[in-house]
Curated annotation (Swiss-Prot):
<dbReference type="InterPro" id="IPR000347">
    <property type="entry name" value="Metalthion_15p"/>
</dbReference>
<comment type="function">
    <text>Metallothioneins have a high content of cysteine residues that bind various heavy metals.</text>
</comment>
<keyword id="KW-0480">Metal-thiolate cluster</keyword>
<dbReference type="Pfam" id="PF01439">
    <property type="entry name" value="Metallothio_2"/>
</dbReference>
<comment type="similarity">
    <text>Belongs to the metallothionein superfamily. Type 15 family.</text>
</comment>
<protein>
    <recommendedName>
        <fullName>Metallothionein-like protein BIF98</fullName>
    </recommendedName>
</protein>
<dbReference type="GO" id="GO:0046872">
    <property type="term" value="F:metal ion binding"/>
</dbReference>
<keyword id="KW-0479">Metal-binding</keyword>
Amino acid sequence: MSCCGGNCGCGSGCKCGNGCGGCKMYPDLGFSGESTTTETFVFGVAPAMKNQYEASGEGVAENDRCKCGSDCKCDPCTCK
């Protein structure tokens, strides 16, 4: 498995998208021995959720079933 390990995102046409920056993609998520605490509050109103039968006829994103494999190539690519 490459060091992208889940940081790859498949873009349009089942090509690997802009989500793969390599091992140092998220430097602040590394372990440096320091500990910090961050609190985030999100306030807002979300639209009502549709049940699965109402939402099933709507468009599906082109990269819905793609995921990036070990070498940042899409694996498997089953986009419809």
